[in-house]
Swiss-Prot record:
Family: Belongs to the TRAFAC class OBG-HflX-like GTPase superfamily. OBG GTPase family.
One Pfam family hit: GTP1_OBG
OBG-type G domain ranges (all copies): 160-333
Major location (coarse): cytoplasm
Taxonomic source organism: Anaeromyxobacter sp. (strain K)
Name of the protein: GTPase Obg
Gene Ontology biological process terms in this record: ribosome biogenesis
Length: 354
């Protein structure tokens, strides 16, 4: 399935039906009074969270969405039928913005959550409503009001507890495939991951959702590489695992420089991202060169005024993964006591996969 995380759509609620001008036409009542019914109300446009969805693909090619109009009133005091609501289903984590102003209208997260995003027009009153002692035969009725319409931007921000960030080819996809049942595409070249992947990780008697965020590069906050389209998914994460490639980085790159560069991109995108708790891990330590680079980074960051722990991990051999997951779990659940059991166990099924 293609992953689509931002779309622009136009929604139009149904118009209210017009009220009717009609008269009683019954035997033995030659001058029957007004009997025009009211018009029906127009249908609303409603957004509803569907937990089975993980992308906005359905709205990529269908941009116009209109609810039903209310029916007109008729004689014999009969009101028009209300127009049916139009329910648009969206995945959890959908943020809705007004396309013209950029104002955030709602943030939809809970399964089944509903919000009326465009209100249907009100049905007009029939002439029977305007009869009075001074005007017993009104020859007019009220028109229905038009339904609301607006342009919307739908943005999907993944609902994950933990985000895995780092340069392309840092080993993010391999890591998530080891600690969960997610099975992302893995290859030894940059930008293999073009869509975020979600996996559920079991830790002690709890679980949390991890997102493998596609690789970031310098300038990502301004749209370079895969751009800030994926940085938005990090915003909801409570904790970040920052992976640093220890083995064979590109010429001119080093683990410390990679770490600082990605942190600079997070800070440039949002102050809130820069403040999120991070667990730093050097990957691929099954390669001697990477292990040596990891030990060096441990010493560098350990000498800071506020020391930063660095985990050395190998997704190939599993070394260091238990300690890494313990650090993540404690950061998420604020548990200070060290875990005396095994590491993160796999659950039977990931929460979602794009």
């Amino acid at each position: 399935m293609k992953f689509v995380d931002e779309v622009k759509i136009h929604v139009k609620a149904g118009d209210g039906g017009d009220g009717a001008v009609a008269w009683r036409r019954e035997k033995f009542i030659p001058r029957g009074g007004p009997a025009g019914g009211d018009g029906g109300n127009g249908g609303d446009v409603v957004l509803e969270v569907d937990p089975q969805l993980s992308t906005l693909l359905d709205y990529r090619y269908i941009r116009e969405h209109k609810a039903r109009n209310g029916e007109k009133g008729s004689g014999s005091d009969m009101n028009g039928k209300d127009g049916a609501d139009l329910v648009l289903r969206v995945p959890p984590g959908t943020v809705v913005k007004d396309a013209a102003t950029g104002e955030q209208l709602c943030d939809l997260g809970a399964a089944g959550e509903r919000v009326v995003i465009a209100k249907g027009g009100r049905g007009g009153l029939g002439n029977m409503n305007f009869a009075s002692s001074t005007n017993q035969a009104p020859r007019y009725a009220e028109d229905g009001t038009p339904g609301a319409e607006r342009d919307l931007v739908l943005e999907l921000k993944l609902l994950a507890d933990v985000g895995i960030v780092g340069y392309p080819n840092a080993g993010k996809s391999t890591l998530i495939s080891r600690i969960s049942r997610a099975r992302p595409k893995i290859a030894d070249y940059p930008f293999t991951t073009l869509t975020p992947n979600l996996g559920v990780v079991g830790w002690r008697e709890r679980s949390f959702v991890v997102a493998d965020i596609p690789g970031l590069i310098e300038g990502a906050h301004a749209g370079a590489g895969l751009g800030h389209q994926f940085l938005r998914h990090v915003e909801r994460c409570r904790v970040l695992i920052h992976l640093v490639e220890g083995a064979n980085p590109e010429p001119g790159r080093a683990p410390r420089a990679d770490l600082d560069a990605i942190n600079a991109e997070l800070a440039a995108y949002s102050d809130e991202l820069a403040k999120k708790p991070q667990i730093v891990a050097v990957t691929k330590i099954d390669v001697p060169e990477a292990r040596a680079a990891g030990v060096k980074l441990q010493k560098l960051l350990g000498r800071r005024k506020k020391p930063v722990p660095v985990h050395l991990v190998s997704a190939v051999t599993g070394e260091g993964l238990d300690a890494l997951l313990d650090a993540v779990g404690r950061a998420l659940f604020k548990e200070a006591r060290p875990h005396r059991g095994g590491g993160g166990k796999k659950l039977a099924k990931p929460r979602a996969r794009a």
